[in-house]
Amino acid sequence: MKSTSFALMLAMLAAPAFANPDVGGAPMFETKNIIENAVNSADHTTLVAAVKAAGLVDALMGPGPFTVFAPVNAAFDALPPGTVETLLKPENKATLTKILTAHVVAGDFTAADIAAKAKASKDGYFNMKTLSGDALSAKVKNGKVYVFDESGNAAVITIADVDQSNGVIHVINKVLLPK
């Protein structure tokens, strides 16, 4: 039964979509890059402000491909009070850059790719190296794809496979933190 459920989940994740999902109330276009789409999402205003403050706009407009695990505003709001404001200060640019690039993996990995690689591994996890040099791992539990940072904190992919001209975005519900 587990194999059938997993196969069904993979089939649903891999099913071709005729259009990208809307994110944050805005359409996402496959012909636009990560930044061009993200700036239109009402759910990612904090992330976009952080990317600008870290000076990562040009990098994320580059050819990629990139897989971005994009935390929603509520994920940043869940951090301890004052954290975001402190990170956005110019003197904290290096720390902010490290945190943000810990959400970006080189390559274009769909949720089905991630799930299949996790399922095929001996330990059930797909291990990824981020642009910051940190590690993320992903596992499928109860039909959902979870992404873990190096401390074991988990985020759930809430909107998968938002195709971009230079990669893919997966919306997540938590901020992943490097060690």
State where each predicted segment sits:
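Gram-negative bacterial Sec-dependent N-terminal signal peptides
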Residues: 1-19
